[in-house]
Amino acid sequence: MGRAKRIPYGVSDFIDIIERNQYYVDKTMYIPKLEDEPDALFFIRPRRFGKSLFISMLRAYYDIKRKDKFDKLFGNLWIGSHPTENQGKYQVLFLDFSKIGGSIDQLEENFNAYCNECIDSFIETYQEYYPERVVESVLKAKTAARKLNAIGIAAEKKNLPLYLIVDEYDNFTNVVLNEQGEEVYTALTHASGFYREIFKVFKGMFSKIFMTGVSPVTLDDLTSGFNIGWHISTKPAFNQMLGFSTEDVRELFTYYKENGEIRPDSDVEAIINEMKPWYDNYCFSKSALKTQSKVFNSDMVFYYLRNYRETGEGPENMMDPNTKTDYGKMKKLLQLDKLDGDRKGVLRTIIENGEIIGNIEESFPAKLLVRPQIFISLLFYYGMLTIKGTRGEQLVLGIPNNNVRKQYYTYLLEQYDEVCAVDEMSLKSLFTDMAFDGQWKPALEFMAQAYAKVSSVRDSIEGERNLQGFFMAYLNLNSYYYTMPELELNHGYCDFFLLPDLTHYDTKHSYIIELKMLSKKDFGAMADNGRQTKAEEQWEQAVEQINRYADAPRVEALRQGTKLHKIIMQFEGYQLRKIDEID
């Protein structure tokens, strides 16, 4: 048995993966599907879904300079037995706009310098196809547009097919939009802006174009000058083109098990089931809902595999630390620090309900980002929402997994922290006592006190849904439980079930937590029955509810042998008035 393939975590160079014997999940069967589409294509996916690797594969497949390496690079892949007529046919210009940075004053200069370097490299690579005077004129030209025009005229005369591949086409424009504002952004993408002008040149000279990005915003603002693009991001044929299907993940772990790289007693199905709530559940096409399995985030799967191979178990922290960097970028792109009330309301609805009803706009200009419906679409393209179902003609868009849910809670925690900082380290220590010693009261009272501090500063937070949102955010700081809000038990929905994570910790206790709130006016008022206060009546009803939840048949399996605690917390406004465990 030969050496097992390397795990390509973070690798985006297709040739490097093949030549250095790294594991590759075959996506080459999508090549003929792409060729059936129009010649200029835009494809949007969230970060860490393998966009750069996919277009690296396309480069290797279509590049005329690599035509003779087809068998070496693709012989063991699907396309190796099903090559298309276009294999090795094109001169390929590749541009990665994430490499363009600098201050706004230097942006045009840096953009031109980067493009010049790429175009010079292009003409040097393919100089045998051009007259010497053309090569010289390209190298001497001062601007990218002039260089491209010189190549375009010469290529057309000699009938040379050109392929343009652009990675992260919207990277620096998104940064400009969010750091410099709409006016500066518009200057780049409208009228005679340099970015728009270069796209006009692209339009006239390339036989095929493939562009990727994370948002369709720039696409919309460029399209009147570049109106030949075809947006395939939500087409069912390409729903699984990036990311991994469940079968891909099964084959991946089975391969490493059979090659002795992970424990021989590894339960592949159990591994998949552990990863699913964290990395799976993406659906990018309404038409794929009932016909295709959901999609895993591929980078996260490799993160898990790498940890599993090293330690014999999944990572203690199921969130890849690199996700924190992604959150920072996403926070800027979504302008989370500048949200108005309507868009904050969208986030609140998503955080509290786990989903929202809406539709996905295929493209939209930057000036419409302030609209709540457009904001929903933006969250979808960034991978913060996914298609869960339909409601009439509208879509049910939900949080795809725990990895993304944690990012929402991070946003919520930041909002609370701006009002009144909470000592998270102390709270995490109390969670440890809660998990191993069953000492639940200090942790829950700590959160109740924090809620009161935040609410006293900002009265608008008061309300039962906001109480639940607050507790949900802080309960998710614990590492010992999966916090399950609104879990259905015996035809009702408990506020929180703390499901022990026994895969990573020997947790001894589990919890059902029910939160109840009455206004200050109602708390001491008499109930309609005339026998007790509304607070007393509410408490009685809560006891009946929580006992019914605990008697649900599935609770026995959920608590996994741990001791189950039934806790009710009752608030008068934002002040905790009663907390108790129900026997």
Predicted region positions:
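Extended alpha-helical interface modules used as scaffolds for assembling large macromolecular complexes
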Residues: 229, 294-544, 548-550, 578-583
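P-loop NTPase motor core
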Residues: 10, 26, 60-124
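Walker A/P-loop-proximal flanking segment of P-loop NTPase domains
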Residues: 1-66, 71-79
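A short beta-strand-to-loop transition that corresponds to the Sensor-1 phosphate-sensing loop
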Residues: 98, 167-168, 202-227, 568-574
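Amphipathic alpha-helical segments of the small helical/lid subdomains adjacent to P-loop NTPase cores
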Residues: 218-225, 232-306
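Substrate-engagement module of ASCE P-loop NTPases
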Residues: 150-158, 184-209
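Domain-level recognition of nuclease-like catalytic cores that cleave nucleotide substrates
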Residues: 554-583
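Conserved P-loop NTPase "ATPase switch" module shared by AAA+ and STAND
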Residues: 158-188
